[in-house]
Design a protein with these regions (language model features):
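N-terminal presequence-like segments and the immediate start of the first folded domain
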Residues: 1-62, 66-80, 85-136
Length: 136
């Protein structure tokens, strides 16, 4: 039986409940939904990267990347990405940011992806992203 390893990096905010930012079991790594919070600073409440979709999207992608790396993975190991937006009006901008980010990252093959509008994010947050990676 392969051991399950919870991943919560020091750079991330402490989860508000009993969950981790990612879990790896064998060659499978699930990154929990990440939002655009800036890296954790002791004594500071979780702080969004900024009020704009651009700021939050880029920080959210970096937060997903850091969990992938903590689990020994990278973007090319990702099989599925799920994006949750709070406003249908953000689709075009998010797609442009997403495409530019992955072009800059040198992604070889695009993973499957799904974007959903979800209004249940905490106030001020515009985007959440999770990812499923298979290593090897």
């Amino acid at each position: 039986v392969t051991e399950k390893t919870a991943l919560t990096t020091d750079a991330h905010t402490t989860p508000p409940a009993k969950f981790s930012h990612g879990v790896r079991k064998g060659n499978i790594l699930q990154v929990a939904g990440q939002v655009g919070f800036l890296p954790h600073v002791e004594g500071r409440a979780p702080t969004p990267a900024g009020p704009t979709l651009r700021e939050q999207t880029l920080q959210t992608l970096e937060n997903v990347r850091s969990v992938l790396e903590a689990g020994g993975a990278g973007w090319d190991d990702v099989m599925m990405i799920r994006v949750y937006l709070t406003d249908t009006g953000h689709f075009a901008e998010m797609n442009a940011l997403y495409n530019a980010y992955f072009e800059e990252q040198g992604l070889k093959e695009a993973p499957a992806a799904r974007t959903t509008v979800y209004v249940g994010l905490p106030a001020g947050l515009l985007i959440e992203i999770d990812a499923l990676a298979v290593l090897g």
